[in-house]
């Protein structure tokens, strides 16, 4: 099937993009990597009257760590995240998740910001950003605002992003001291959406957990943050007792639905096991291991 007719726009500046989005309102749709949007267009599940291609807008693919913040531009590609040595060493949960997004073709073109704006509950990036306590910079013609990841997702394929706004940047508190992370994903086959996935980010201080982030993928109407599990870890040595308690709390936070991929009990158990494995892997990385 071919997409419904649309008018194509290719702005060259952020200001031009925001002007277009302000004019078009609900009739406009932003095109980033296109790995989610283009299939929807072909199936006519989405039929916007206007497409606004932001790939020519400079500055949207930046990545830098400065003034205590890691800034990731919305057009930063999955493949670039996978290959970044800085991310692999300081934010391994990002690099590990990037390497498990779909397949090489999608990773080459797809963008972090586009995936987040699409807000598929089985998408990889939402849980990662929840674990990292990220916030998203949303810009419109009238100004900009920052929205915490936990407040950004409002349901399946639904976010706080307004039709006249552009997601321009993801901001993550810079890693401090000994940090570690992990992303574990269960899929039916390589390149598939997650049946269950768990993202973990840890910061350790004198053998104790200074901060912990745990995000859950594909076990709810949106990506979930296991806040009680995170709170249970803070200030404690990351021993087996702490890991097991956090894993139980993460499983309790999950809201899975039974489907052809597995029962509710099965998915909760995967959350439990992946949280245990993720915390142990993150602990080893925080200690300087692989």
Walk through the language-model features, giving the residues of each.
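C-terminal structural segment of proteins
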Residues: 1-290
